[in-house]
Amino acid sequence: MSCDCHPHVFGDPGKFPDRNPNPLQASREASFEDALRMHEAVGFRRGVLVQPANYTTDHCCLEEALARIHRGRYRAIGIMDDMVTDAELARLHAAGMRGVRFNFVRMFKMAPSPRLLQSSIERIGQYGWYIKIFIGPEELPNAIETLGAITAVPVVIDHMARLKPVDGARQEAHDLVLDLLRRENFWVLLSNGVRMSAQTSGYHDVVPIGQALHAAAPDRCLFGTDWPHTHSHNEGGGPPESKLIALLYRFLPDAAARQAVLVDNPARLHGFV
């Protein structure tokens, strides 16, 4: 069963208010039911819901979504800080959480301290969770030593590290990501190519990047829609998910690669059976 490894859900703002004092964009409702309809329309049978930055460590909306249709088909990724208790971690694991996300992108002002990152890794290790890293080429050189030292848990690099296609394989960040993917515990999410592209259609400039990342770690690549595209530059909220999947297919050489990225790899990482 195909898996979308990176949708977000937003509940009714009256019930689930923003917790981030400086959100880049106010939440607009995009319910779990809406996400399910999108998944059914494009053929996803599994999903990994990612906690929006707007909610910080308040996972109530995410927990409610998982409770509605967990049934072994959906997992979740949360946000971690020192205020998250051991009891919360146990409850979130039982609900379906399988990892935590750290945001290094400067404009969000949410980068973790090395101490928080290390303590979080130690705390989630008992559950077999992984960490997701949202980072871009501007932040990667300064973070590479910290990231390279992570060996105890799997690490998923979100959104192809937001690599810039205008620089192609010559940019420093491109080589740094490939170096990380040579480590057996590093994975990459082949997503957000449309936003990375300097083109308004076709998105040919990001195809070599996706192909290179897949070639570096074909058994550790995932895909995510990033629905509902909350920070899209387009008023319409981003391209149809069918276009995102079509772009993914251009990264992958054959049907076996598509099976791995959409079905086998996410099942192995998230414990789907």
Spans of model-derived segments:
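Mid-to-C-terminal alpha-helical segments outside catalytic/metal-binding sites
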Residues: M1-C3, R28-R46, P218-R220, N234-V273
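Mid-domain alpha/beta scaffold segments of enzyme catalytic cores
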Residues: M1-Y127, H204, K243
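Divalent metal-coordination and catalytic microenvironments
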Residues: H6, L62, V100, I124, ...
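A cross-domain feature marking catalytic cores of carbohydrate-active enzymes
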Residues: P7, V50-Q51, G78-D81, F102-F104, ...
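Active-site environment of divalent metal-dependent phosphoester hydrolases
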Residues: F10-P13, N54-T57, M83-V84, M107-F108, ...
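Alpha-helical elements of Rossmann-like donor-binding domains used by nucleotide-donor carbohydrate transfer enzymes
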Residues: D34, C61-E64, S119, N142, ...
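Short, electropositive alpha-helical surface patch
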Residues: T57-R73, I157, I209-A217, G238-Y249
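Catalytic pocket-lining loop regions of alpha/beta-barrel enzymes
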Residues: S113-F223, H231
